[in-house]
A protein has these predicted regions:
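Primarily a LysM-type cell-wall glycan-binding module
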Residues: 48-64, 96-131, 151-153, 157, ...
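Acidic, glycine-rich catalytic/binding loops that coordinate metals and/or anionic ligands
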Residues: 362-364, 405, 412, 455-461, ...
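Non-catalytic cell-wall polysaccharide-engagement segments
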Residues: 36-43, 51, 256-377, 515-544
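Ser/Thr-rich, Proline-interspersed low-complexity disordered segments
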Residues: 32-114, 137-140, 157-178, 355-356, ...
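Short glycine/threonine/proline-enriched tight-turn/helix- or strand-capping micro-motif at secondary-structure
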Residues: 356-359, 363, 374-414, 445
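Zn2+-dependent peptidoglycan hydrolase active-site motif and core
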Residues: 406-456, 478-480
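Catalytic glycan-binding domains that act on GlcNAc-containing polysaccharides
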Residues: 168-325
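Short alpha-helical segments in extracytoplasmic peptidoglycan/chitin-binding modules
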Residues: 115, 120-138, 150, 218, ...
Length: 544
């Protein structure tokens, strides 16, 4: 941790001491708690942990020992590459698994943690290595829902050594949020005049300029284009300069794998790592990063999802000895990011929290016509790509044929909205109708056939026709519709604090992606790609 950061944190703790003592006093009088536990005088010596951000800001846990920082010299690190193999193991996010750390023989004072936007009690418990019932608080908080930012939680201090605790980027700089709507990607590239300004790449739908490639990855994965452009510059110097070697030409993000050659595949790999970090932290299922040599680092519990996304990505690209410097060194990524775009925390103030605590899902119906029988073929799984946010569900129409055929059945609008984007297999419905899928609720449909597909600019009512199920777009072995939700650019987990509910059927995640069920009034439909009798679901009698 940088010397200036530590000083800032000490100042912040002193400035909040009075506030902390007042809050604890109110708590002792009110005896309101998440867990009705006894509070001793010992608890009043707790360690405060305040989320903070911005240049020179961060969150710290003084008892945790930060890893030694080795800052790169000379404008970056030479040959910062990760070598991948075609059969590398994938991270498969699941539900939070509570594995509390052992109680210390001599307990340390508890931590006073102030919640951040997007926090839930189960996720916070996993990050701190405790059970949810061990966390106490001076006022009631939701047991599974989103918690207001700034709420005090008193948590047993069991973590010993963790990684760097400095907040790197706000969440809105990771996802394709409203803060990126005014970003001129093409203009920025052309004004910089580097290698990217003349770069072109051939994709499945023809030749694309560099800004088209970056935007395609950004909008498909809902990852901020500012971030992707900065990563290309930091790793390969493509924005303002030229690649320095052949590896930077073919593998600009540093993942050397012959199957991931070229800008599009490199970016696609990178956004998957960002999504694993971001949504794994959000969902309370990621607590550490692992480096290529097998060493592991426990993530500091006070981090935000955006910072974890970066820590996870760079752990896949750099050895541990260089990782700290890449994250927060004077020649590190964040310094470059601020140089390119200014203070990201100032932009975040206008758009965060991305998921307000009072947010509710609008009424949604099943994505097919009344009277038709479909199958629930996929429980919560990745919204886009092989890994990431488990925000999507799959439904397949009845068919006498297996495999990939365009169905005569229709997928329908789960809610009223404006069609703002179509592509191969893709339809995106903007529910607030402002024309941007990065604001408010948006619904992604995947595997919609091009034939008879609804057009961009069409306003549809709930239940209107969207298109025919098929295998178009993405990877599919059978005809179906893949559907996922976003809010303010963030994928909304299907079985999270804002569960996916269609005609009253609530999604429940299984142990692995694609597993899970739909539940309603005591009825349970388990997902299965087999399309068996038990998976059948219809909209007869209002979705029963």
């Amino acid at each position: 941790m940088k010397r200036g950061i530590a000083c800032f944190l000490k100042t912040r703790f002193r400035g909040n001491r009075l506030q902390t003592m007042l809050v604890l006093g109110v708590w002792l009088l009110s005896i309101l708690a998440c867990s009705q536990g006894y509070v001793s005088d010992y608890d009043l010596t707790a360690t405060a942990l305040f989320p903070a951000g911005g240049s020179g800001g961060g969150a710290a846990e003084p008892e945790a020992t930060a890893l030694p920082s080795l800052q790169p010299a000379g404008g970056g690190l030479d040959n910062p590459v990760a070598v991948g193999t075609p059969g590398e193991a994938r991270f498969t996010p699941s539900q939070p698994i509570f594995t509390p750390l052992p109680t210390r023989s001599t307990p340390l004072p508890p931590i006073l943690y102030y919640t951040q936007a997007g926090d839930t009690l189960p996720a916070v418990a996993v990050r701190f290595g405790v059970l949810p019932e061990e966390i106490t608080c001076p006022e009631a908080v939701p047991q599974t829902g989103l918690i207001n930012a700034g709420k005090l939680l008193i948590i047993p201090n069991r973590l010993e050594q963790t990684g760097p605790a400095e907040l790197l980027l706000p969440d809105s700089e990771i996802v394709f949020s409203p803060s990126a709507l005014d970003f001129d990607l093409k203009g920025t590239i052309q004004q910089a005049g580097g290698y990217l300004s003349t770069y072109r790449e051939y994709l499945a739908d023809g030749w694309k300029s560099s800004d088209e490639v970056i935007y395609k990855v950004a909008v498909e994965n809902s990852i901020n284009p500012r971030l992707l452009l900065a990563l290309v510059e930091y790793q390969a110097h493509w924005v303002y300069g030229q690649p320095r070697n052949l590896a930077e030409v073919d593998y600009p993000l540093g993942m050397i794998n012959f199957e991931k050659k070229g800008l599009y595949k490199q970016l696609s790999w990178a956004v998957q790592q960002l999504s694993i970090g971001y949504y794994g932290w959000r969902n309370g299922i990621l607590t550490e990063v692992q480096f290529s040599d097998g060493s592991r680092v426990r993530l500091a519990p006070g981090l935000n999802a955006g910072s974890v996304a970066l820590q996870y990505l760079f752990s896949r690209l750099y050895p541990q000895i260089l990782w700290n410097g890449v994250l927060g060194g004077e020649e590190g990524f964040i310094k470059l990011y601020e140089k390119m775009y200014g203070n990201p925390w100032m932009r975040a103030q206008a758009v965060e929290p991305l998921l307000p605590v009072n947010l509710t899902q609008p009424e949604l119906i099943l994505p097919f016509l009344p009277g038709r029988v479909w199958s629930f073929t996929g429980g919560p799984h990745s919204a886009w790509g092989p890994d990431g946010a488990r925000a999507a569900l799959d439904f397949a129409p009845a068919s006498v044929e297996t495999g990939c055929e365009i169905s005569d059945d229709w997928a329908t609008a789960v809610a009223a909205g404006l069609v703002v984007r179509t592509d191969t297999g893709v339809v995106v419905l903007d529910l607030d109708g402002d024309g941007y899928e990065q604001t408010g609720w948006a619904i992604l449909y995947l595997h919609v056939a091009s034939k008879n597909r609804v057009s961009v600019g069409t306003w549809v009512q709930q239940g209107d026709l969207i298109g025919h199920p098929s295998c178009e777009g993405g990877t599919s072995t059978g005809t179906h519709i893949h559907i996922a939700r976003k809010y303010n650019g963030e994928w909304v987990l299907a079985d999270g604090p804002l569960p996916f509910v269609l005609d009253g059927w609530r999604a429940v995640a299984g142990k692995n992606p694609y597993e899970g069920s739909l539940v309603k009034d005591g009825q349970v439909i388990n997902a299965c790609t087999c399309g068996s009798f038990e998976t059948r679901i219809s909209r007869l009698n209002g979705g029963n």
